[in-house]
Amino acid sequence: MREFLVLFNHAPTSPDRVRLKDLPGSGRFDLVCRVTTQALLYSHGVRTDTVVHLLLRGPDDPPKTITVTGRRVRRLYPDERTTAIHLRRALEADPDTEPHPGIFVRRADLEDLLGEMKGAKLYYLSEDGRDLEEVEPEPDAVFVLGDHEGPTPEQDRLLRRHADAVISLGPIPYHADQCIVILHRYLDVKRPPEYAHGPSNVM
């Protein structure tokens, strides 16, 4: 199983703060949606071997973690608005529930999640990390990264203590959703998933 854990320290945890007509102005909830779709969708399909954990720590009810499981999720489309509707419904729901097929919400912070992931190969993405090609990460692993503002210093220290390796995608900083696409491409080549049908340029 391939997992992504993405930290959004200012993304809202209250559904009332997610404005569908202004996702960028809703604590950059547009980025949360893009990370979700890029982690789980490929051309004409859903990555059934992938899970994405969205750690939200913004107002008004932090922390909340929304987990979207590719094997179970239904009606996930590339547009941000539809994804935002699903995620906002998760924020409306009681903790420890599945308000939409394949979308779970619970009250968990970074330390809780890292404790649950103990024993898994864990890679932390940071600009000062070792080159991806040098580390050659396992396809079945957890990849942790921050949003455009990055982890807090405390989160950074915690991740470095838990990570099997700190990795970098190169000298140019990318958005979180772009990092996920780059990782997918690298890992898909290393071990093509069951749903792969050979080379394709269709996006």
From Swiss-Prot:
Keywords per UniProt: Cytoplasm, Methyltransferase, S-adenosyl-L-methionine, Transferase, tRNA processing
Pfam families in alphabetical order: Methyltrn_RNA_2
Catalytic reaction equation(s): pseudouridine(54) in tRNA + S-adenosyl-L-methionine = N(1)-methylpseudouridine(54) in tRNA + S-adenosyl-L-homocysteine + H(+)
Source organism superkingdom: Archaea
Gene3D superfamilies registered for this protein in UniProt: 3.40.1280.10
CDD domains for the chain: TrmY-like
Covalent S-S links between cysteines: none
KW Methyltransferase (keyword) present: yes
Biological processes annotated in GO: tRNA methylation
Protein residues bound to S-adenosyl-L-methionine: L125, G146, C179
EC identifiers of the protein: 2.1.1.257
Primary site of residence: cytoplasm
Any Gene Ontology CC annotation: cytoplasm
Location in the cell: Cytoplasm
Any one Gene Ontology molecular-function term assigned to this protein's record: tRNA methyltransferase activity
HAMAP family: tRNA_methyltr_TrmY
PANTHER family: TRNA (PSEUDOURIDINE(54)-N(1))-METHYLTRANSFERASE
Function: Specifically catalyzes the N1-methylation of pseudouridine at position 54 (Psi54) in tRNAs.
Annotated family: Belongs to the methyltransferase superfamily. TrmY family.
Subunit structure, interactors included: Homodimer.
Protein's UniProt name: tRNA (pseudouridine(54)-N(1))-methyltransferase
Gene source species: Methanopyrus kandleri (strain AV19 / DSM 6324 / JCM 9639 / NBRC 100938)
Gene coding for it: trmY
